């Protein structure tokens, strides 16, 4: 079974003994990864979650909490991950607290980017109270879907909402917001009301020039990793247990980071 999942994940066949050796090395690497000192040289912090299935002792859904940091020099690093029961405030509190205990005090941290989930936002405000929050504008626009009276409006109204955030100044954004409200209020008042609620909190990205502005306004930097993890996890359907899940996820992260892209690795080359 181990050789089968390795082939599914990485597209290569290896012996059972090699898999056993890799598993032992991964256990060591996972421990080191979760205990390593992070330091406090991060300018931006991205937080997100990915839901997966664990089958033992019973079949349950777990969420993989992930943190990506952007340093002062612009380099990116996957800081941590954790399997959690939910995205509640208490789980996010524990996850972020661990980052702080390992050196990420937040003295240089300017903004935290997330999908705007209430539990995460509450934990962020408590643990990094002086750090600005930038809700992902893509999630903000797509949240409209849940409040539509007519689902046939979905693509057009979301496109219009995303267009609002393409403006490069606060004045332009607010002008586009007024036009958006004028166009859609009579057709979709509930959706418009939801979009306007908390809108001003979504404009932190406008305080920065490009390309930082583009990078900050969505969760894309960390979503790229989650999409690749999701693509490789799907063939497995589920994990046998939390320890197996953590080991495999770490191995996948190591593999993904070592693929050609614009994100430097931590020290995953030790797995080679």
Give each language-model segment a name:
Residues 1-6, 176-177:
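Short, charged amphipathic recognition helices of the HTH superfamily
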Residues 3, 20-23, 158, 226, ...:
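Hydrophobic face of alpha-helices
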Residues 5, 9-113, 118, 122, ...:
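RNase H-like nuclease fold core
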Residues 12, 16, 106, 134, ...:
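Alpha-helix N-cap/helix-initiation sites
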Residues 110-118, 123-160:
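Conserved beta-strand -> loop -> alpha-helix junction used to position metal-binding or nucleic-acid-contacting
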Residues 162-272:
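Acidic/histidine-rich catalytic cores and adjacent linkers
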């Amino acid at each position: 079974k181990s050789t089968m999942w390795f082939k599914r994940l990485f597209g290569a066949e290896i012996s059972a003994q090699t898999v056993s050796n890799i598993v032992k090395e991964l256990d060591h690497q996972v421990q080191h990864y979760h205990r390593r000192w992070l330091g406090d040289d991060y300018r931006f912090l991205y937080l997100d979650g990915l839901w997966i299935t664990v089958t033992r002792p019973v079949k349950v859904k777990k969420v993989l909490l992930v943190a990506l940091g952007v340093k002062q020099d612009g380099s990116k690093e996957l800081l941590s991950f954790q399997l959690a029961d939910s995205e509640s405030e208490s789980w996010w509190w524990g996850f972020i607290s661990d980052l702080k205990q390992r050196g990420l005090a937040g003295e240089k941290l300017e903004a935290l980017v997330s999908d705007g989930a209430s539990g995460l936002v509450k934990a962020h405000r408590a643990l990094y109270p002086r750090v600005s929050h930038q809700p992902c504008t893509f999630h903000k626009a797509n949240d409209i879907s849940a409040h539509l009276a007519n689902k046939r409006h979905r693509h057009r109204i979301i496109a219009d909402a995303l267009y609002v955030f393409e403006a490069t100044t606060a004045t332009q954004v607010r002008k586009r917001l007024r036009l958006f409200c004028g166009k859609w209020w009579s057709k979709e008042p509930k959706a418009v009301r939801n979009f306007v609620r908390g809108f001003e909190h979504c404009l932190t990205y406008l305080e920065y020039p490009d390309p930082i502005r583009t990078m900050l306004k969505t969760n894309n930097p960390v979503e790229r990793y989650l999409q690749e993890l999701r693509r490789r996890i799907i063939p497995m359907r589920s994990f046998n247990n939390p320890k197996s899940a953590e080991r495999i996820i770490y191995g996948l992260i190591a593999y993904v980071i070592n693929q050609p892209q614009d994100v430097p690795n931590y020290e995953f080359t030790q797995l080679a």
